[in-house]
Amino acid sequence: MAKQKKHPTGTIAQNKKARHDYFIEHKFEAGLVLSGWEVKSLRAGKAHLTDSYVLLKDGEAWLFGSHITPLTTASTHVIADPIRTRKLLLNKRELERLEAAVAQKGYTCVALALYWSKHLIKCEIALGKGKKEFDKRDTMRERDSNRELQRAVRNKGKED
C-alpha cells in the first residue's frame, strides 16, 4: 500500500497590504477553481496576493490579480498563465450579501489569504471599506502605543 502524503498545513500566501489599506468588516471562506499546475505551485508556496481583488459579475465571484508562479517541472503541454482570473466558489446567500455590500459606496471585496483546509485550498476574502491616509496614521499610532504598553508591562515584571 502506498504511503499517504501529508499535505502542508497553514497559510500559503497572505495579503498584508489589504489589512493595511482597508477596514475589514466581514470575512468569507471561498473555494477556488484551479488547474493541476496551480495546485503544485501552491504546494511549493509560490503565490502572491498583494494586488489581488474580488470582482462580482453575473452572479459569480472572480479573483483578479493573484499571481501563482508556475513550477519549472510542471507540465509542458499546458500554457501556464500566472495571472489568470480564477473563479471563487461561494454559496448563493454569500454572493448576494457581497453584491449588496459592494453596491454601497466605499465597500470593496479583497482577498486576504490562501490556505489549506484539510486537502482543499481555500481563499479568505473580506468585505472592506477603504482607509483614508489619516486612518492609516491613527492605526499606526494605536499599534505603537499598544506595543509600548506591552513593553512597559513586560519590563515592570522584570524589575521586581
From Swiss-Prot:
GO CC terms, sorted: cytosol
Residue segments, region Disordered: 136-160
GO BP term (any one): trans-translation
Principal localisation: cytoplasm
UniProt superkingdom: Bacteria
Which keywords does the record carry? Cytoplasm, RNA-binding
Alphabetically, the GO molecular function entries are: RNA binding
User: Where, per UniProt, does this protein localize?
Assistant: Cytoplasm
Question: Is Metal-binding set as a keyword in this record?
Answer: no
Coiled-coil segments, which residues?
none
Task of the protein: Required for rescue of stalled ribosomes mediated by trans-translation. Binds to transfer-messenger RNA (tmRNA), required for stable association of tmRNA with ribosomes. tmRNA and SmpB together mimic tRNA shape, replacing the anticodon stem-loop with SmpB. tmRNA is encoded by the ssrA gene; the 2 termini fold to resemble tRNA(Ala) and it encodes a 'tag peptide', a short internal open reading frame. During trans-translation Ala-aminoacylated tmRNA acts like a tRNA, entering the A-site of stalled ribosomes, displacing the stalled mRNA.
Say which family it is in: Belongs to the SmpB family.
Q: Which NCBIfam families match?
A: PRK05422.1, smpB
Protein name per the record: SsrA-binding protein
Q: Which organism is it from?
A: Pseudomonas putida (strain GB-1)
